[in-house]
A protein has these predicted regions:
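Catalytic cores of RNA-modifying enzymes
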Residues: 1-224, 252-255, 266, 275-282
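C-terminal lobe and adjacent flexible extensions of AdoMet/dcAdoMet transferase-like proteins
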Residues: 223-284
């Protein structure tokens, strides 16, 4: 059975009583899950956490390479389908549940003892940001390789000053080194979505790019700086910190960080945000 063949997909769904697509976009180009699995670095010493396996095309490719695969799936209607498609792969296990509510670090510790843990998934577009955030914050993966909407991939990898650069860019780049690997066109899916997808790999940093006294405050400053993109950094910070610091104090913090008072938040890289956060914290 070819899980990327339209005829085989329809036959599989029919055997399990589904006449329609179940609201999913099925991969119909076999090179896509194969190349994603290859890019993930899955191998005989790795345990792979997958989120949202669908009918299992990526799961199968991962199971052929990795020592073990644990695929988190929330939709119970997919369990009998996955039981069939993964039957030849005893090293692949479906984990029932919501990835957003599970303790991912504990799950990895339980399932992948003695293995290098990596994450690999074709993520549903509507939960990309919270799932990626959870994977990064779990702090237990050697790499995270995911297919997501191209627009989000560009934001994650964006440089300061670009229109795609934002608070999520800073978050991902502070914790990881992201790399856009390749794009996947709408024609690779059935039905074809209206957007292009992209595969990215995020490798967690062994040490943060900046030494911060307070990570939480740093990201509070980052979010405030991007909250009103068309306004200056000073105005953005005023909205967030105006109840605690006067505009003159905020202006002084910006200048103490070596930044012009009229700069916009999207011009700042991680080092500048770190210096600014320190200057602000010294005035609180």
């Amino acid at each position: 059975m070819d899980l990327c063949n339209e005829k085989d997909i329809r036959a599989l769904l029919g055997r399990h009583g589904f006449s329609k697509s179940m609201g999913q976009n099925f991969l119909i180009e076999g090179w896509v899950p194969r190349d994603i699995a290859e890019a993930s670095g899955a191998g005989p010493d790795t345990g792979v956490l997958e989120i949202g396996p669908g009918i299992g095309p990526l799961t199968v490719q991962l199971a052929r390479r990795a020592a073990k695969v644990a695929a988190i799936e929330l939709d119970r209607t997919l369990y009998p389908i996955l039981a069939e498609t993964l039957a030849p792969y005893p090293n692949a296990e479906v984990v029932p549940g919501d990835a957003m509510k599970l303790d991912l670090a504990a799950l990895v510790s339980d399932k992948f003892s003695g293995l290098t843990a990596i994450a690999c998934a074709n993520l549903p577009y509507n939960i990309t940001t919270p799932v990626l955030t959870a994977l990064i914050e779990a702090g237990c993966f050697a790499s995270i390789t995911v297919m997501i909407q191209r627009e989000v991939a560009l934001r994650i990898c964006a440089a300061p000053g670009s229109s795609d650069y934002g608070a999520f860019s800073v978050f991902c780049q502070y914790h990881t080194q992201p790399e856009l690997l390749f794009e996947v066109g709408p024609e690779c899916f059935l039905p074809a979505p209206k957007v292009t997808s992209a595969v990215i790999r995020l490798v967690p940093r062994s040490a943060p790019p900046q030494n911060l006294v307070d990570d939480s405050f740093f990201f509070q400053v980052v979010r405030a700086s991007f909250a009103q993109r068309r306004k200056t950094l000073l105005n953005g910070l005023s909205s967030a910190f105006g109840s605690r610091l006067s505009k003159d104090a905020l202006r002084g913090a910006i200048e103490a960080a070596g930044l012009p008072a009229d700069i916009r938040g999207e011009r700042l890289g991680i080092p500048e945000f770190a210096t600014l956060a320190s200057a602000l914290q010294n005035r609180l």
